[in-house]
Amino acid sequence: MAEITASLVKELRERTGAGMMECKKALVEANGDIELAIDNMRKSGQAKAAKKAGRVAAEGVILARVASGFGVLVEMNCETDFVAKDAGFLDLANEVADFAVANKGTTIEALAAQFEEKRASLVAKIGENMNIRRIQYLEGEIIAQYLHGAKIGVLVAGQGSDEELKKVAMHVAASKPEFVNPEDVSAAVVEHERQIQIEIAMNSGKPKEIAEKMVEGRMKKFTGEVSLTGQPFVMDPSQSVGDYLKSVATSVTNFIRLEVGEGIEKVEEDFAAEVAKITAGNA
């Protein structure tokens, strides 16, 4: 039996909106598998579609560079927001991004090796660990970039207007689509969601035949919600991104989005417990 930690229960609560006891029970039944627990809770009606995993916990910056026919995003992490604003840290991060765009196709391993000496020197000076975490390239006829406070970086590849593609990049930063078009959603993702929706419909007392018909409409909504062109445009929610792109004679072929610390869980200090520990030690 996997250990059901408080942090795991907390994550499930944040992602489903369900109560603590329901979340703990679901995790026990799923043997600690949070994704299975979410699926089971959705099937039983205890939770709606869960928020995508990826708690932003680490600090650092996202940098973007665009050259002819391609662009690159780089994530560099540190331990605190204070260091993320340090001039020395930012200088190194910008050096890394400049190297990445000047050496198209370089790997994260090559970047780490190239800047290891400077990184180690800065760690010794500042007294805080830091690392080059991710690098992603995007090719295209036109590449538009958008950075949101150095915490979120987006590159959008497409054809047409660079100005319009930048607006779409801002939308991607805000709405987090996973695919370009509804038809791009993988068969595995579609089938997984379809089975969940069928069970939800059947659990409401509907025969399987009727449940399957109900699911068709829900699946169309689902693929629209996770795809860029199917989402309501943040700058004009009365139309979809796809309709907006058609109106300005612009198209998107691909995009990438990085957010500082995605998937990294920061250790949360229990201040009261820490004070009690120190007090006991001084007694």
UniProtKB/Swiss-Prot annotation:
Keyword Cytoplasm on entry: yes
Main location group: cytoplasm
Cytoplasm among keywords: yes
Region (Involved in Mg(2+) ion dislocation from EF-Tu): 80-83
A GO cellular component annotation in the UniProt record: cytoplasm
Domain of life: Bacteria
InterPro entries named in the record: EF-Ts_dimer_sf (IPR036402), Transl_elong_EFTs/EF1B (IPR001816), Transl_elong_EFTs/EF1B_dimer (IPR014039), Transl_elong_Ts_CS (IPR018101), UBA-like_sf (IPR009060)
An MF annotation (GO) of this entry: translation elongation factor activity
Keyword tags: Cytoplasm, Elongation factor, Protein biosynthesis
Localization annotation: Cytoplasm
CDD domains: UBA_EF-Ts (cd14275)
Function: Associates with the EF-Tu.GDP complex and induces the exchange of GDP to GTP. It remains bound to the aminoacyl-tRNA.EF-Tu.GTP complex up to the GTP hydrolysis stage on the ribosome.
Entry protein name: Elongation factor Ts
Species annotation: Haemophilus ducreyi (strain 35000HP / ATCC 700724)
Gene behind the chain: tsf
